[in-house]
Amino acid sequence: MEINKDNIANWLMQLQDSICSALEKADGKSKFLEEKWERAEGGGGRTRVMKDGAVIEKGGVNFSAVHGKTPEFLLRDKEHSSADKNASEFFATGVSIVIHPNSPMVPIIHMNIRYFEMTGGVKWLGGG
């Protein structure tokens, strides 16, 4: 697979599908409901929410891929000093997950993975 923003976004959509499928199977009762959305400045995403399950009280697995004009604060940020100060465009995509189980003995899950790039070649992959 060539590493480019479109392939990364497609892989992250597949990751969202895979995670939702596995959680539905593990829960056995509830299913994710999906709402698609668009960002006026460019891009959009899919919000998926599950609630009142056998194991999961409420959870969300969300995907986004947005683009537009690079915010000025990123162009001024010293951490990104290698960025082209005239970089006018950015692209960002990611998946975020928040799961609240029914049992207080089971930990809450909160994680995300994201990819960001700006015109001029600055790009990074992160998560937490």
Language-model features: locations:
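Gly/Pro-rich turn-and-neighbor structural signature
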Residues: 1-82
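Internal mixed beta-strand/loop scaffold within catalytic domains of large alpha/beta enzymes
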Residues: 47-125
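Flexible glycine-rich active-site/ligand-binding loops centered on an Asp-His dyad
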Residues: 128
